[in-house]
Each structure stands twice: as structure tokens, then as C-alpha cells.
Regions:
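Short loop/turn motifs that connect adjacent beta-strands in outer-membrane beta-barrel proteins
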Residues: 11-12, 58-66, 104-113, 151-157, ...
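Flexible loop and strand-edge segments within Gram-negative outer membrane beta-barrel domains
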Residues: 12-64, 72-94, 130-132
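Membrane-embedded beta-barrel scaffold of Gram-negative outer-membrane proteins
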Residues: 66-80, 200, 236-300, 309-313, ...
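Surface-exposed extracellular loop regions of Gram-negative outer-membrane beta-barrel proteins
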Residues: 32, 167-169, 177, 191, ...
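Signature of Gram-negative outer-membrane beta-barrel scaffolds
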Residues: 111-204, 209-211, 220-224, 318
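Gram-negative outer-membrane beta-barrel transporters
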Residues: 152-154, 159, 259-275, 290-369
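Transmembrane beta-strands of outer-membrane beta-barrel pores
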Residues: 21-25, 73-77, 120-126, 163-169, ...
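Outer-membrane beta-barrel "beta-signal"
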Residues: 246-250, 419-431
């Protein structure tokens, strides 16, 4: 269930709220990636409650003030029961506040949109029973950020410069505290020499602190010939720092084949240099698994998207390939993505607002994996949908989707099983 609404208190003051309630009851393997050991079926119950409140002040006579404050809370409880296994449950709660102001001003050599603000949130995790894979602890995260997006007055050029300061602190009763902080600048530029062509480039830095699970988990990872491979805590994990560079181009053509059609194409290349990259190592000799830092890692890849819209059909096509390598040893890290092509076609059925859809996801075999890890075969997964958007009631929408229609058994490039055949119902009404 999802609901949201807003109210205009005055012309300058607005407020709103949203609520999302989710419940799921299922019977599933304790760990779907295991084929040995205690991996019987578990009764699993999941309940998630998300709530958000926001207030916005935007006076029409002052282009420098457009401030929005948001309070949010997310609470997730997962309880699992199984035969011959102690019940386990865990609760994850995230609460935070975000304040941002956007200012519009004209300062040579163009128009500026300034965005600046702050965010604070706390994540808390509490396990019970045998849920040692999810350690007790909390994380406090504080951010300050600033960005200036400038549109040149006399040239078709957009320039973005900004910076973000992040401060991270985690606590676990057994391991104590971990603190980290980082200033992450970024810059981007886009040029549109014609109405149909756009070229862009960017460079940005970021940091990622280790999660509680990466530092503290100590449960069974998997079984091999009846013997367990355990997670080993690593309290010496360092935060990950990286620099990403991206370059690409896009085109947009209107009236290509018919009067009302549009073709959009966009493609880009990205490369990331990471320091203290957080990866996972599986030691089969000692039967243990743990997270560790790769001193220097290289991640790179390609993204391409195409979108064709017309009165007769809509077609979206996307392609991605991502590689990851230890820059020192030249070994694959196995956290990339093999050649993956996604095709999404929607065709109107009649003139009453009904559309039929077909989505195909095609993935090549994953061969650039860690040394000793198995290669994953390629796969093709097809999904079908039927949606209804009545012309007379534009605020209503309903759809039914059959995901993985042929119940294909496959794993993605990281070895995670894909969901089986699933039927989803969706409806939306706005007033």
C-alpha cells in the first residue's frame, strides 16, 4: 500500500506526507545459494513501514529562497522460523532529516541554480535468536553539500561544480567505534552544438564506509561437502575512496518516421579508480569468508540507452557492461556485469488506454570472475504485462505483470539466483 498527498497552506507554504506499508509471507530456502548443509525451508515474514513528512517554503517574489525540509522513517522487521533451527528475527530502522535550499540567480556569464543543504540519518540494527549474520549496531551519517549548475548565456553550455562533505560513525557492542570523513568534489560539463546533439563529461570523487555486515558478520556463508564456510569479522576495514570519470553523447530526433515520433540515443563510458576498494574473499582451504580492502582497484564499463516513441509503439533498449579488476595483481574482482541487453516494448491495444508489454533481459556468460569462482552461464528472461490508463480518467492506472514468464532458472553474474515466475498487480489513483 502506498499513499501520498500534499496541501498548499498559502501560495508560499506547502506541506505533504507519504506512507508505504509492505508485508510479505513466504516459505523459502534459508539461503537459496546453498546446496549442502542445513538449508531447509523457512517460514519468513517481512514487514516494512515507511513514512515521510515534508514542508516547503518558496515565496514567489524571492528567487533565492526555495527551501524544503524532509523528515523520514523506515522500519523493517524480518522474522524467520524453520524446522530444527532456532527462530531468528532482526529489525532495521532508519530515521533522518534532510534540508535543502535552491536559489536562482543571474551572475555573469550565465544563469545559476544553486543547491545547498544538509542531511543527517541514523541506521539501527537489532538481531535476536540465531540471526548473528546481522550484527547489532548503529550508524550515524552526516552530510553537507553544495552545487552550482550554470547555463551559459551566449553559448549552449551547462557547467556543474559542487562538493559534498560526509561524516560517518558506526558502533558495535563488541568492536567499538569506527569513524571516517571525506570531502568529495565533482564537476561536469555538457555542450549542445545543435538542437539534436549533446555531449557531456564529468569527474567526481566519493567515499563509502564499510557496512556493519561487512565488518562484523560471523555466521555460516555456505557448506562444501558437508563442511561449513564461516564469515570472519574484519574490524580493520578502511573506508573506500574513488574517483570516477565519464564521457558520452546523446542525440534526439523528432519526426523521424512519422509526424509524432521521437528517437533518443545516449551512450557513455565510465572509469573508476578506487583506493581501499571493499571486496569479498572466499578461502576454501581454511573454509572462511571475509571482507577486505583492495589497495587499488579499477572499475570501468559502457552504458547505452535508446528510446523510440510513436503513436504505434514505444521501444526502450539498454546495454551495459561493467568490469572490475585488482589494479596491482591484475586479477578480476568478479563484481562487474557481463554484456547485458534489455528490451522493453509497449504496444497500444485499440484506443481505450490498454497497452501490452514485452520485456526481454539477455545476459552473456560471466567469465571475468575471481580466481577459483565458477563461471555463470548466460540467460534470457522474458516478462509480459498488460496495463490500463483510461483516456477519460488520467489519474488512474492499473497493470498486471508476469515476470520471468517461462520460470527460467538462472543466476546473475555475481551468482545471485534470479526470481522465478512472479505475478504482480499494480494500481494507482491520484486526486
Amino acid at each position: 500500500l502506498f499513499a501520498k498527498g500534499s496541501v498548499s497552506i498559502t501560495d508560499s507554504n506547502k506541506a505533504g506526507a507519504s506512507l508505504r506499508l509492505y508485508q510479505n509471507n513466504t516459505t523459502e530456502p534459508g539461503n537459496p545459494t546453498l546446496t549442502h548443509g542445513d538449508n531447509g525451508l523457512r517460514d519468513r515474514k517481512t514487514a516494512q513501514n515507511d513514512v515521510q513528512f515534508w514542508y516547503q517554503y518558496s515565496p514567489a517574489d524571492n528567487s533565492l529562497i526555495n527551501v524544503k525540509s524532509t523528515l523520514y522513517l523506515s522500519d523493517i522487521t524480518i522474522k524467520t522460523n524453520g524446522h530444527n533451527k532456532t527462530a531468528e528475527w532482526r529489525n532495521n530502522r532508519t530515521s533522518g532529516v534532510n534540508v535543502v535550499n535552491r536559489s536562482h540567480t543571474l551572475i555573469f556569464p550565465g544563469a545559476h541554480q544553486l543547491s545547498y543543504g544538509a542531511e543527517y540519518y541514523r541506521q539501527q540494527q537489532k538481531p535476536e535468536g540465531s540471526a548473528t549474520l546481522y550484527p547489532e549496531g548503529n550508524i550515524d551519517f552526516t552530510s553537507l553539500y553544495f552545487q552550482d549548475e550554470m547555463t551559459m548565456k551566449s553559448n549552449p553550455v551547462n557547467i556543474i561544480v559542487g562538493s559534498r562533505y560526509d561524516r560517518y560513525k558506526s558502533f558495535n557492542p563488541r568492536a567499538g567505534k569506527l569513524k571516517a570523513e571525506r570531502l568529495s568534489p565533482r564537476a561536469a560539463i555538457s555542450v549542445s552544438p545543435t538542437d539534436w546533439l549533446m555531449m557531456y563529461g564529468s569527474i567526481s570523487s566519493a567515499f563509502r564506509a564499510p557496512t556493519m555486515a561487512e565488518m562484523y558478520r560471523d555466521d555460516v556463508h555456505f557448506y562444501r561437502k558437508g563442511k561449513p564456510n564461516y564469515w570472519v569479522p574484519n574490524l580493520n576495514l578502511k573506508p573506500e575512496n574513488n574517483i570516477t570519470r565519464e564521457i558520452g553523447a546523446g542525440i534526439q530526433l523528432d519526426g523521424l518516421l512519422t509526424d509524432n515520433d521521437r528517437l533518443q540515443l545516449k551512450g557513455g563510458y565510465f572509469g573508476t579508480d578506487a583506493r581501499n576498494y571493499i571486496a569479498t574473499r572466499v578461502d576454501m582451504k581454511r573454509m572462511r569468508s571475509y571482507s577486505y580492502n583492495v589497495s587499488r582497484a579499477r572499475i570501468w564499463g559502457w552504458d547505452m540507452q535508446g528510446n523510440y516513441q510513436s503513436d504505434y509503439f514505444d521501444w526502450m533498449l539498454s546495454y551495459n557492461r561493467t568490469e572490475s579488476m585488482d589494479a596491482s595483481s591484475r586479477e578480476w574482482l568478479g563484481s562487474g556485469n557481463p554484456d547485458t541487453l534489455i528490451s522493453d516494448i509497449s504496444i497500444p491495444v485499440g484506443h481505450g488506454g490498454v497497452s501490452a508489454g514485452w520485456r526481454a533481459e539477455l545476459s552473456a556468460a560471466a567469465t571475468h570472475v575471481k580466481k577459483g569462482d565458477p563461471h555463470q552461464a548466460g540467460y534470457a528472461v522474458h516478462s509480459f504485462s498488460l496495463s490500463y490508463k483510461p483516456v477519460s480518467v488520467k489519474s488512474f492506472e492499473a497493470s498486471v505483470t508476469l515476470d520471468n514468464a517461462f520460470n527460467k532458472l538462472a543466476m546473475n553474474g555475481k551468482g545471485v539466483p534470479l526470481s522465478g515466475r512472479t505475478v504482480s498487480l499494480y494500481t494507482r489513483y491520484q486526486w
